[in-house]
């Protein structure tokens, strides 16, 4: 292609626009019922009819001046707009001359041979069509591959949803097991508190039993002491009885061994000693018997009272001891049952913890595998998306090149055909732009459908 440059000299061109004259008629203030007319040409020429100044007052003069200034500004604006229109007309005339020169240059180039250019463009078009066909086949394979990958992604998403539902079920089961473990721990804590209270009561009962046993031991020691004292008293009484018997035997022997009584005049000494000795022995015996009786009565009363108290205390202590033994036995039975239940709960708790740990490990393993699969398929999707974007970019580039070539070929074809209708460059450009817009729209529709 060749570029033709034209210059436009505004000074040597005669403008066909003639100066225009404007006639403006203004009505004066209504209060004065006066009117005036102004005639202004392009040279700003004005005239006022005589006799008008005589009818105007000072306020009318002020209004007239303001109106006059306003009219002047309007005329200046109109003159500026007119000058702008004139400049536009000059520019359009220059453009027309430039286009006419370019058209004349193109008509003069008809004799030149454009066959090599046409062949080159046809070869490029053939190569572009071949590349487009190859890209279309590659696009079909890529679309099939993408569809397969999308199906695989959908199946993997379903599998991920299944795993997520299973993990939710496992989490709910873990929460329920944790709540059950908490209930068991609360019950176990209650049982421990109950066992502690029962152990405290058992310790108190043991202390009471120890006190009762100490009291029994003290009472038994007192009983042994009283029994030994009673035995000693019996032994003492037996000794005194034997002593009395000894004294009786001694007296009898003395009576047998005594000499013949001396007869004192007026007094029988045998009878005297016999009566005195018998009296002394009787006094001693009576005093000893009284003392023995008093001691025996005291000992018997004390012994009987102690025996009665011991018997009543033993009965009461025996009942209390039996009750305490029954209570201790019952508490031991309950403690054994609670220990068995505690052992069972501890075993169950350990099994539940082991099951929870196993489920947690399984969930973490599934989550890890799921995350790895997700990362892998996201990478595959990203790679395929990048590849598809690159293919679409190449296809769009080739399509743009094809459309550009077709437009250039169409332009050269019209130039070579030599139309005599003298179509301007503007119509050719508009037609080319319309073809390019239609090609771009068809390419966009094709890309969206693919």
UniProtKB/Swiss-Prot annotation:
Q: Region (Linker 12): which ranges?
A: 259-275
Q: Coil 1A: where is this region?
A: 75-106
- Residue ranges of the region described as Disordered: 1-50
Q: Report whether Nucleotide-binding shows up as a keyword of the record.
A: no
Q: Where is this region: Coil 1B?
A: 121-258
Keywords, A to Z? Answer: Acetylation, Coiled coil, Cytoplasm, Intermediate filament
Renumbered residue ranges of the record's region Tail: 424-450
Composition bias (Low complexity) maps to 25-47
Q: Does the keyword Transmembrane apply?
A: no
Annotated region Coil 2: the residues are 276-423
Q: Where is this region: Linker 1?
A: 107-120
Which Pfam families does the UniProt record give? Filament (PF00038)
Give an example GO biological process.
nuclear envelope organization
Q: Where in the cell is it found?
A: Cytoplasm
Instruction: Point out residues bearing the modification N-acetylthreonine.
Output: 1
Limits of the IF rod domain: 71-423
Q: Name one GO molecular function term.
A: structural constituent of cytoskeleton
| SMART domains in alphabetical order | Filament
Residues covered by region (Head): 1-74
Return the GO cellular component terms, semicolon-separated. Answer: cytoplasm; intermediate filament; nuclear envelope; nuclear lamina
Protein family: Belongs to the intermediate filament family.
Q: What does this protein do?
A: Epithelial intermediate filament protein.
Quaternary arrangement and interactors, per the entry?
Can form homomers.
Q: What is this protein called?
A: Non-neuronal cytoplasmic intermediate filament protein B
Species this protein is from:
Helix pomatia
């Amino acid at each position: 292609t060749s570029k033709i440059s034209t210059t436009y000299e505004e000074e040597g061109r005669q403008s066909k626009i003639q100066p225009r004259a404007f006639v403006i008629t203004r009505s004066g203030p209504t209060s004065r019922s006066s009117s005036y007319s102004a005639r202004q040409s392009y040279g700003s020429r004005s005239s006022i009819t005589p006799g008008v100044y005589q009818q105007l007052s000072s306020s009318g003069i002020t209004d007239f001046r303001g109106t006059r200034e306003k009219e002047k500004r309007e005329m200046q604006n109109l003159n500026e707009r007119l000058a702008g229109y004139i400049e536009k007309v000059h520019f359009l005339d220059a453009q027309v001359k430039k286009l006419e020169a370019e058209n004349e240059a193109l008509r003069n180039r008809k004799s030149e041979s454009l066959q090599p250019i046409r062949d080159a463009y046809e070869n490029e078009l053939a190569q572009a069509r071949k590349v487009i066909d190859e890209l279309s086949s590659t696009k079909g394979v890529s679309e099939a591959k993408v569809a397969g990958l999308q199906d695989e992604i959908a199946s993997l998403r379903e599998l991920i949803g299944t795993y997520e539902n299973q993990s939710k079920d496992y989490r709910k089961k873990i929460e329920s097991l944790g709540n059950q473990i908490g209930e068991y721990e609360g019950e176990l804590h209650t049982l421990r508190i109950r066992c502690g209270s029962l152990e405290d009561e058992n310790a108190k009962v043991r202390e009471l039993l120890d006190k009762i046993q100490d009291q029994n031991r003290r009472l038994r020691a007192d009983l042994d002491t009283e029994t030994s004292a009673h035995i000693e008293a019996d032994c003492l009484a037996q000794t005194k009885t034997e002593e009395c018997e000894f004294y009786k035997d001694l007296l009898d022997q003395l009576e047998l061994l005594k000499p013949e009584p001396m007869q004192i005049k007026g007094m029988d000494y045998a009878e005297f000693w016999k009566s005195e000795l018998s009296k002394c022995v009787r006094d001693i015996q009576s005093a000893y018997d009284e003392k023995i009786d008093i001691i025996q009565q005291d000992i018997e009363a004390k012994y009987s009272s102690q025996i009665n108290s011991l018997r009543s205390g033993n009965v009461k202590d025996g009942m209390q001891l039996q009750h305490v033994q029954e209570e201790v036995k019952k508490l031991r039975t309950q403690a054994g049952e609670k220990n068995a239940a505690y052992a069972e709960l501890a075993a169950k708790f350990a099994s539940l913890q082991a099951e929870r740990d196993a489920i947690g490990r399984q969930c973490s393993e599934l989550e890890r595998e799921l995350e790895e699969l997700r990362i892998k398929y996201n990478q595959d999707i990203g790679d395929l998306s990048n590849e598809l974007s690159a293919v679409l970019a190449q296809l769009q580039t080739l399509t743009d090149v094809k459309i550009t070539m077709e437009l250039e070929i169409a332009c050269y074809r019209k130039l070579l055909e030599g139309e005599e209708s003298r179509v301007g460059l503007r119509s050719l450009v508009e037609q080319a732009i319309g073809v390019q817009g239609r090609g771009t729209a068809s390419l966009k529709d094709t890309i969206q459908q693919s």
